[in-house]
Amino acid sequence: MSDPRARLTLGIAAIALALYAVFFAGDYALHVLTRAGIYAIAAIGYQLIFGRLGALSLAQGCFFGLGAYAAGLGALELGLGFPLTLAVGILLPSLLAALIAIPVLRLASHYFALATLGIAQLALLVATNWTAVTGGANGLYGVPPIDIGSVSFGHGLPLTLLVWACVGLALTLSHRMTAGKRGLAVETLREAPLAAAALGVDGAAIRFRFFVASAALGGLAGALQAHAIGVVSPDVLQFHVLVLILAMTVIGGRASPLGAVLGALLLVHLPEWFRDFADYYLVVYGAALLAAIIFLPRGLAGLFGKSKMPPVETADAEAPRDPAPLTLSVETVSKRFGGVTALDGTSLTLAPGEILGLIGPNG
């Protein structure tokens, strides 16, 4: 977000969203905005690994669900308050990502995707069958609302503002990880890994940091989800959660964290606009994803990108009026060493200060 236009657009959008939430949105609209903010955090995290590094991870839904379960169990079983449940919700997915990163990130792209999908499915099986801890298919009920000291953020406007403040923190983290030379290193690693290695870019360390940061933001989103709705069930680990986060990232613009926010706002509101087609939401998401790929290859964020500047007309360069005198002039020189012809009719001229290398059969 170093582009001034992008910062201005983000600032205007944030102010407009805050004004809408404070003065115009009802309780249900605030609930939808809260859900959009939660998924925006998960999508910003996914944009780090998928958009920036180009690695198709299928475990972001797993990290989202793990964060929700960690926060729910921390509140219900350990009696932890909100700041601590939030920390647990971030820490547990981050630790899992750190443990699996070393073997998984060494895999080629399609094997990496399959490995992360296997981890996600394993997490779903554990959540469904480990009834003594996770509640099985019934899940966890009664996760307390968010209270910070004597201030309640349980629902309505306070919860919405808190969630979107976390969106701002997620955007800040993403920006700090991809700004300046770090961003150039990441882009080089994505487009030309061999060139990046030749330039001294530590690709393994970058992939590790981005994978763990992606999981941490997924866990943060899941923890907020658990407190926002008070229920955690195996549904948070289902494949459709990943599909939703992936669609948000692509439709919004995989190259931009702001695009992830725009994609979340759009796709969370789509079911509200098309309630009559609620049973076909995956079809709607698929159609929106296909349309974005065809008509908006840079996503919604591409609509706010830098405009192309017209080419600058330049005058033809004039030849120097007083050319420098020649120091050396060679015409049609030939040289043979036995049966090897080193030079055959070679001509060249050298001006003062000019350096010329002549490479023949012997180097």
Question: Where in the sequence are the language-model features?
Answer:
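Conserved structural motif at the start of ABC-family nucleotide-binding domains
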Residues: 328, 343-345
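Alpha-helical transmembrane segments within multi-pass membrane transporters and channels
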Residues: 78-121, 262-263
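ABC-family P-loop ATPase nucleotide-binding domain
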Residues: 303-336
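Membrane-interfacial amphipathic/re-entrant helices at transmembrane-helix boundaries
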Residues: 1-41, 70, 77-85, 155
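Extracellular/periplasmic helix-loop junction at the C-terminal end of a transmembrane helix
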Residues: 119-153, 183, 297-307
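Helix-loop-helix "hairpin" substructures at the membrane interface of multi-pass membrane proteins
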Residues: 154-233
